[in-house]
Structure formats: C-alpha cells, structure tokens
Amino acid sequence: MLAALKTNLNDIHHVTVMNRRVRVLASHLAAQITGGGSVLDVGCGDGSIAQAILAQNGALAFRGVDVFLRPRVAIPAQVYDGATLPFSDGAFDWITIVDVLHHTDHPGRVLAECLRVARRGVVVKDHLRDGLAAETTLRFMDWVGNRGHDVRLPYNYLSTPDWRALFARIGARATRWTTDLGLYPAPFSLLFDRGLHFVATIEKA
C-alpha cells in the first residue's frame, strides 16, 4: 500500500511540480548569474536546470558533476566523490548547486569546496527550516521527490540564522538572497512555498 501511495505521489509531483520547478528555478538562477562565462553545476542530475538556464543566457558554458551520473544528461558531466571537486582553484566563473547541500552531512565543507573552484560566486538553491512545521513539511517534500531514486535523505535542513552562521564560519557572505521563488502552483504554494526556499549568491568575504 505504501509503495502504491508513493507511486501516485510521484506521478502528481512530476505533473504539478517538476516542469514548473525547472522553469522557475532556471529563471531565478539566471538572474543571479551576470554576463557570460563558465559554470559548473554541482549535483547536476539530468542537466535540465542547466539547459533551461542556457536557454535564457546562451553566453554561458555549462559542465556538470554528480555523485551518480544518469544515463542521459543534457550537459557534459562527470562523476565526482561528493567531497573534492576535480578542478583547480578558480577553474569556473560560477558554480550552481541546487537542492544539494541539505542532502549532505557537512554542507559547510561542500560549499567551501565550491567557493574554492568558483572565481565569481556560487549560486545556491536550498531550503530554510523557518516557520511552523517547516521540518515536517520539508521532510515530506524530500520523501516524495527523492525516495526511491538513489538519493541520500539525511534531512539536514538549516534555518536562516544557521545559514548565516555557516557562511561566516567558512569565510563567505551572501551578496544576493531571495526567498520569493513561487515554485509551486496554487493551492500547493500555501503549504510548500511560504519561505521554505531560497536562492542566493555566495562569495568569499
């Protein structure tokens, strides 16, 4: 019964969320990546978000890395170990990392490694454990979106003060920050948007 429920939820999630999510996220990310240059997408998945950003800014050149490489990826991509990016310091102008950090045990280490490789900045999309029942809501969203897809689910969500403290700890700062993303259509937005997500540009302090 649980398996059937999960299958039904996956179908609903794909129809109502995924296509819109790619389009909306690409718009927010593209707005924070100014000009052209090289971009490394960390945790690139199937490359659909990078592809959607390219449709808005053809002056960018994307490459992807992930701990598990899918059979089809829309951008050139390679496997990495999830800890050390196989590139020299400042190898890329930008890094994008979308809904990856909360799947790691040490998000500060992962973000610091991204900052090492990025010349201009790291554009992060992740969650905020802010507000009523935020933890429960985020866990449910992660379970629906990722369970059964070989994705680690440590549910490592941070609040806004936690993120600010993390940035300070690794010698970084947020130069742009937005929580008004509009990822979900009504009525789902009332439960699943409500300040639970952010996109930010992180630079070395």
Question: What name fits each language-model region?
Answer:
Residues 36-45:
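Conserved class I S-adenosyl-L-methionine
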Residues 104-113:
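A short, conserved alpha-helix within the catalytic core of class I
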Residues 120-127:
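Conserved beta-strand signature within the Rossmann-like core of class I S-adenosyl-L-methionine
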Residues 99-100:
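Short catalytic micro-motifs in class I SAM-dependent methyltransferases
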Residues 46-84:
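Class I SAM-dependent methyltransferase SAM/SAH-binding core
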